[in-house]
Each structure stands twice: as C-alpha cells, then as structure tokens.
Amino acid sequence: MESNQTWITEVILLGFQVDPALELFLFGFFLLFYSLTLMGNGIILGLIYLDSRLHTPMYVFLSHLAIVDMSYASSTVPKMLANLVMHKKVISFAPCILQTFLYLAFAITECLILVMMCYDRYVAICHPLQYTLIMNWRVCTVLASTCWIFSFLLALVHITLILRLPFCGPQKINHFFCQIMSVFKLACADTRLNQVVLFAGSAFILVGPLCLVLVSYLHILVAILRIQSGEGRRKAFSTCSSHLCVVGLFFGSAIVMYMAPKSSHSQERRKILSLFYSLFNPILNPLIYSLRNAEVKGALKRVLWKQRSM
C-alpha cells in the first residue's frame, strides 16, 4: 500500500438525503414501526412463555423467529433513527463492522428458522401420526441451535474476509446502515473474492432453502386436499398460507437485493429493499403469522383474563 494512504476510523452514513422536515417525519414514522415491531414480537414471546398450550414445536420456532426479528431490527434501526435527527451522521469503523456482522447473522438465522418452521408444518400435515416422534423437544432444540450457530459462523466468514481488506476510503456510505455491499466500496483493494463468496453464500442460504420450501409446500398442498374435514382443511390452509406469505416476502426481497444484477436497480431502490426486510418485515411476521392465529388469540385472552382476576 502506498505511504500516503490512511486508514479510515469513522464512516459517514448518507442515509436518505431528504429535506430536514421530511427527515423528522421519517423519524416519527420509523420510530412507530420499530416500537410496534418490539411490542408485537414481545407479546408473542410473552404469550408463548406464559401459556403452556403454546409449548409446541411450532411455537418454539415462532419464539425464535420473534427474537430474531427484534434483534434484526435493533441492529440497524436505532442508528438510523439517530442519524435522522443528528447533523453529523457518522459511525466509527469498528461499530460499523459489528453492525454488518450482526445484520448478516440475524438475516441468515431468519432464513433458516423459516425453513425449520416449514419443515415442522410439513411433518405435522404430511406425517401427523409420527409428528410427536419426529418433532420432539430434543430435535427442536438441535435444529434451532444449529440455525443460530451456523448463521453466526457464516457471518463471521464474511467479516473475516472483509477485515483482510485495506480500508483507506472513500469515507462515505450511501446507505442508512453499514450494509455489506456498501462496506466493500470503502476498501482500496480488489473485492471480487468477497463478492463471489457473498453471492455463493446468498445462493446457498436463499435459493436452496427456498426451493426446499416450495417442494415441501407442494407436498403439503396435496396432503391438505386429501383432508376430509372442511374445518381441518381450512385450518391447515390458514396456517400454511400465512407461513408461505412470510417466506415469500422475506426471501423474495433478499434475493432481489443480493443476487439480482447491479444494473437492475439503483442505490435508492436498494435502500428501500433493505428498509423493507429490516423494518417492515419484522412487524409483518407477528401480524401475518401469529396475531391472526386462533391459538395465539386464545392465549392472549387467557392471559388478560388471568391478570384481570388477580
């Protein structure tokens, strides 16, 4: 490296680059969504913990999804909110890399947890007689733990490759957080290896699991159509359609973000996609997948009735 090159110690997050009045509006809007994300997922966690009827594999995975969603949003949104009301929109380099690591780790964990939830529904509907044998507590614990451990290890691989690069500028990131592809642009060296590893990892984490999900749901659809009871068929369709909606929203936006050609969308559209699956998707999960669920509603009524009678 040339002697006149200097290592950057802080990064400027350009954010949304809008008028100050609009920044205040966005601050209030995003703060509301972030608060609802924490509240909605927190309610789900509390209900699953308090109500023994929800101590089933499906809701164990759902509790992990709620934790991931809260962590996922909290890795980026607080700094984004702070930058919307601060004149100096900077972040030190070490916290920037930490933010990249946490964001990647939680994103990968969410992908894998969604796949585990799909597997749980597949076993419940296609192999109902063996469900309690296949999806026992030991299996659920191993599957959930594997999701978390593998996700953080894969994120660590990306961060290790990033830290091998020399960072001497530019100092600005045209994003509202330290998104990994934006961090690549800070390096004053060839990042093709990083980009290849990121693309390969995205294909492995996004395309592969999504194909498994779609194949599983084809089997689930066939099994549902064979159910004789109309009520049972409606309940199965309701649960599975909710999960498929969540999977489609998350995987679809992530695939467009990380695997579509660069020329297909501008940096501003990339920010909107990032905003969707870092802020909007975590609030949609409890609404789509839980709060419309009769068992969750019943658990909420029981908890409120218990509190009222005390």
Curated annotation (Swiss-Prot):
Q: How does it sit in the membrane?
A: Multi-pass membrane protein
Gene Ontology molecular function, alphabetical: G protein-coupled receptor activity; olfactory receptor activity
User: Which Cys residues form disulphide pairs?
Assistant: C96-C188
Q: Does the keyword Disulfide bond apply?
A: yes
Question: What glycosylation sites does the entry record?
Answer: N4
Q: Which GO terms describe its cellular component?
A: plasma membrane
State the compartments where it is located. Answer: Cell membrane
Extracellular-facing ranges: 1-24, 79-99, 158-194, 259-271
Whether Cell membrane counts among this entry's keywords is yes
* Entry's transmembrane regions: 25-48, 57-78, 100-119, 139-157, 195-218, 236-258, 272-291
Cite the ranges annotated as topological domain Cytoplasmic.
Answer: 49-56, 120-138, 219-235, 292-310
Q: Keywords for this entry?
A: Cell membrane, Disulfide bond, G-protein coupled receptor, Glycoprotein, Membrane, Olfaction, Receptor, Sensory transduction, Transducer, Transmembrane, Transmembrane helix
Q: Which family does it belong to?
A: Belongs to the G-protein coupled receptor 1 family.
Role of this protein: Odorant receptor.
What name does this protein carry? Olfactory receptor 2A12
